[in-house]
Regions:
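Amphipathic alpha-helical segments at domain termini/boundaries
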Residues: 1-19, 24, 120-121, 161, ...
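Hydrophobic/aromatic residues within transmembrane alpha-helices
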Residues: 54, 66, 118-119, 178
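Glycine- (often His-adjacent) and acidic-residue-rich active-site loop
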Residues: 56-91, 111, 141-143
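Glycine-rich beta-to-alpha active-site loop
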Residues: 90, 95-142, 146
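Hydrophobic, secondary-structure "cap" segments at the distal end of domains
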Residues: 151-161
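Long amphipathic alpha-helix in the N-terminal Rossmann-like dinucleotide-binding domain
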Residues: 202, 278-287
Length: 309
């Protein structure tokens, strides 16, 4: 494994370190996903391992997908291809949270996009109290939606209304607010993160997410025929249309994805998310936003278009 290190302690706690080779930041890539799947399978099958702590070997915890790789595949990518692309990370996150062993995430710095989706798939999250250690799902600003579980885990974790606020704004959240909202379970000085995670594991916590417990239903979702829920959805659609018009599809897709997904068991909900993500990923709007906002900007800043001499 080039991008991940595994250290198994005599106490049964395994430390999984994210440390992408040849990169200054941990990002989601096909090779990284392969490493994660291999690590999860090894941890699941090793009876000596009783709990896992995920940490980062970089200054920050983890960002999202490599945007350059995403743009590179646009020209030939079909919705079917895009769905398959999203399901690779989705399946890895699902394998992590259902492997039968408690997983704590010790975030030493920012966790955005796919990095925060990984954290959401963990059973316990400890975040550095450094104000720069922000968390969030900024995909809407790229014309996309979180494509590996974010639209489903976030509202189940903190509630539909608060979850939608973060998903539709794409804003980053500082540690103190993240704790208040329930995005993380603890905040601590950076040198205490792993100790806090170990303390949690020492309580012998359950390794099952609440949404996987038989009979679970999110309190705020009692079906679209309930007047309050139907009204919230209708108001949300109107607000999105009023703010963004109909030429910017991501906010409306996020809204529909959340309302549809929260009425379903997690695995079916994740499939709904994947279909909406695939539609957006193959839409020219997202392609142009990513190219204009990030790729072209980075090239310009590096002087790619600057005349010689």
């Amino acid at each position: 494994m080039r991008h991940i290190k595994l250290d198994k302690g005599a106490d049964g706690v395994a430390i999984l370190t994210l440390d992408n080779a040849d990169e200054s930041m941990n990002v989601v890539s096909a090779e990284w996903l392969e490493d994660m799947n291999a690590a999860i399978a090894e941890l699941r099958d090793d009876e000596s391992v009783t709990g896992v702590i995920i940490v980062s070997g970089k200054k920050a915890f983890m960002a999202g997908a490599d945007l350059k790789l995403m743009v590179a595949g646009y020209e030939t990518m079909t919705p079917k291809d895009a769905f398959a692309f999203s399901q690779k990370a989705t399946a890895m996150h699902r394998a992590l949270e259902t492997m039968g062993k408690p997983v704590a995430c010790a975030m030493n710095g920012l966790a955005l996009g796919g990095g925060f989706e990984l954290a959401l798939a963990c059973h316990h999250r400890v975040l550095s109290d450094d104000p720069r250690a922000v968390v969030g799902l900024p995909e809407v600003n790229l014309g996309l939606l979180p494509g590996s579980g974010g639209t489903q885990r976030l509202p189940r974790l903190i509630g539909r209304k608060k979850g939608l606020d973060l998903l539709l704004s794409g804003r980053s959240v500082a540690p103190k607010e993240a704790l208040e909202l329930g995005l993380v379970d603890e905040i601590a000085p950076i040198d205490q993160l792993v100790d806090k995670a170990r303390q949690w594991l020492a309580t012998n916590p359950p390794a099952e997410r609440i949404w996987d417990v038989k009979g679970y239903a999110i309190p705020e979702m009692r079906g679209m025929i309930v007047p309050e829920v139907a009204m919230d959805y209708s108001i949300g659609v109107a607000q999105v249309a009023g703010k963004h018009g109909y030429n910017y599809p991501a906010p409306a897709a996020i809204l529909s994805c959340v309302f549809e997904g929260l009425q379903l068991p997690m695995d079916k909900a994740l499939s709904v998310e994947g279909k909406y993500f695939a539609k957006l990923l193959t839409d020219p709007v997202a392609r142009n936003i990513i190219r204009t906002t990030f790729i072209s900007k980075q090239a310009a800043e590096k002087g790619a278009r600057r005349p010689e001499g």
